[in-house]
Amino acid sequence: GMAVEHLPGRIIAPGFVDMHVHFPQTNVIGSPASGLLPWLENYTFPEEKRFAAPEDSAQAATFFVAELLRNGVTTALTFATSHPQSVNALFTEAQAQRLRLITGLCLMDRHAPGDLLNQGQGKRSGTEQSLLETEALIQRWHGVDRLGYAITPRFAPTSTEAQLRGAGDLAAKYPDVWIQSHVAENKDEIAWAEELFPFSRSYLATYDHFGLMRDRAIYAHCIHFDDNDRALMRSTGAAAAVSPTSNLFLGSGFFDYAGADRVGFQYGLASDVGGGTSFSPFHTMLAAYYVGREGQTKQGLSLSPQH
C-alpha cells in the first residue's frame, strides 16, 4: 500500500515567492529611524560594509537562506551588496540548498559612503568596473540550476547617469535576466530623485529613460504613483514588489491597490527585510490586509485572497 505521512499542526502549501528582500540587512531588522534615508545612513550602510569580507558574506548567506526556507519561501528576489563576494556567497549557498534565488551586484557609484560604492580597479572607474563585474556575474550564474541574475541599481539617486545607461545596455543585451530596484517609496527620496534627474517626467520615468523597464523588471514599493506612472508600469510589463511591513515600519505610505487594479499593472508581495520586520509570508499577508484597509484612496478596501 501507499505510505501515509501525518503532519499535524503543519500547513502543506506550494512554496512562497518573496519578491524583494535584502540579504545583508538581516541584522538591522527593527532598527528605528525617522524615515528611509536616515535609516539607510545610520543602520543599513554601516552593516553592508561588513560584506566586503568573504567569510562574513558566507556566514550571513547560510543564515539568510535557512530563514527563507524555514518560513516556506522557495523563490526570492534578493538584494546583495556592492561587493561581488556577497553575490558569489549568496548564489553558492542558494545553489547548495536548491533555493530558487535571483540576485545581483548592487550598482551604486555615488551618494553613499566611499567604501560602499562600487570600487574601481587599475585605470577603470568604479562605474566601469561595476558594469564589467555585472556582466561576468551574469555569465557565471544566470540560469545555473535554479538561479537567476538581476541587474540591480540600488535606486536611481545612488547611480550616475553613466551607470544607469550601462545597466540599461546590459538589460538589452541579456533580455532574460531580471532587473530590480526601488522607486517612489518615500516623499524625501522622490524629491531627491527628481532633483537629480530633472529631465524625467517622474522618478519612475527615469528608469524607463535608461532602458530599465521591461518584462522581468521588478520595482520595490511603487507607493507614490500617479496614473502616468501606473500606465508606464502596465505598458512596459514591469511589476511592483509591495512591501507592507516595511512601509508600516518606516512610515513610508501605503501601496494603492485600487489604483493599481484600475490601471492594471502587475504586483506581488515582498518582505523587504530589513526595512520589513519579518521573513514570514504570513506576516506580510496580514500587513498587506491592514494596508489595503487603510489605503490612500479607498477606506475599508478588504484584500481578498483572490488578490
Which residue ranges define each predicted feature?
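Alpha-helical scaffold segments that flank or form the walls of functional sites
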Residues: 10, 30-100, 130-144
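Histidine-centered catalytic micro-motifs
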Residues: 15-26, 178-187
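C-terminal helical cap
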Residues: 61-68, 239, 247-249, 294-307
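Catalytic core of soluble alpha/beta enzymes
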Residues: 185-217, 222-235, 248-258, 273, ...
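His/Asp/Glu-enriched, well-ordered alpha-helical/loop segment
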Residues: 209-216, 258-307
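Metal-coordinating catalytic core of metallo-dependent amide/deamination hydrolases
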Residues: 85, 90-222
